Amino acid sequence: MGNVMWQFKSCPDAPPIKNKGKDPDRIKLPAPPLGKTNYATTATPPLAHFVHTFGQDLLARYGERIHKVAIDAAFTCPNRNGDKGRGGCSFCNNASFSPAGLRPASIADQIEAGRKVICKRTGARRYIAYFQAYTNTYARVDKLRQLYDQALAEGDVVGLSVGTRPDCVPGPILDLLAEYRDRNYEVWLELGLQSSFNSTLKRVNRGHGYAEYHEAVLKAHERGLKVCTHMIIGLPGEDRSHAYTTLLRILDLGIEGLKIHPLHVVRGTRLANQWRRGEYTPLMLHDYIATICDLIEMTPANIIYHRLTGTAPAKLLLAPSWCGKKWKVLNGIRDELKQRGTYQGSNLVHSNALITT
């Protein structure tokens, strides 16, 4: 490992959609043969040669491109309104993925707008409705059913991906998601953990601890739900060893997916004030690439990487500037793995290496 430390409707003219809402292989698939293809020394292998990506996983199971459409269903967050805390996480400005700042359009209209862009850009003609902004299980079950049903009523939507906090997934809501899974929709529960260290979670005002995440994963798995865990590299007070430990704790719970991205400083947050005062130093690009490549090597090949970096709108992003250059980051990850001669799962580490502070 690297030696790093750091302070519409379907596309026009598309053939008819078959098997609407069907996941053809809900059983666990074998991991892809990562890193096994021999490329010419002058060739540039795709990132999926090194990493088990969500896009490639869906392509293998559905036989065509499936793309997420982000949805803002006008939720709020219990860490903002007083139920769990006030002010939200120190790094959070949800305008970074809900930039309009106005009440969002209807779910159907958001999907229509998304499919027009995605279809033109990628050719995908089936979609997963990604409930993204704020806490997307923070409502009564009947309200959630109404919102999720609106998304699934679109003929080309094959499933749901629901982003939420680990302290906002009571049993009845997990049961609702399991109902959709039982109807053969693709269903992912995306849990925002960010760090497994309670000291860090308190420092960034998350409003929950690691125990809530642990319990949420166990309850989701009791119902056969797939879990994708969100993790941030570069949180205040953490170094490389914290990232390794958080990853291993997550993997020990048998999760199915991971989203990892760097901490970026956006306007309108307490982190932005700390950065301006010189109290927080963002990661350098080479540090992030080296660290996430270490994590990829430590991750078993069957785990699906839903995300390897994250961006924010240019008008909101303060630092680091490279967080606005998604493809530069992804290409850097690919090139680093190629240079190392490694790939996902090539350097598995046992959890007895954990630090416990």
Model-derived regions, located:
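Distinct, well-ordered alpha-helical segments
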Residues: 141-149, 170-181
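Core AdoMet radical
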Residues: 95-114, 121-141, 156-169, 185-212, ...
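Auxiliary Fe-S-binding modules of radical SAM enzymes
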Residues: 26-56, 60-67, 257, 265-357
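Conserved C-terminal portion of the radical SAM core fold
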Residues: 211-270, 286-309
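N-terminal [4Fe-4S]-dependent radical SAM core
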Residues: 18-20, 27-128
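Short, positively charged low-complexity motifs
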Residues: 7, 23-26
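Hydrophobic faces of well-ordered beta-strands that scaffold small-molecule active sites
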Residues: 67-71, 127-129, 160-162, 187-191, ...
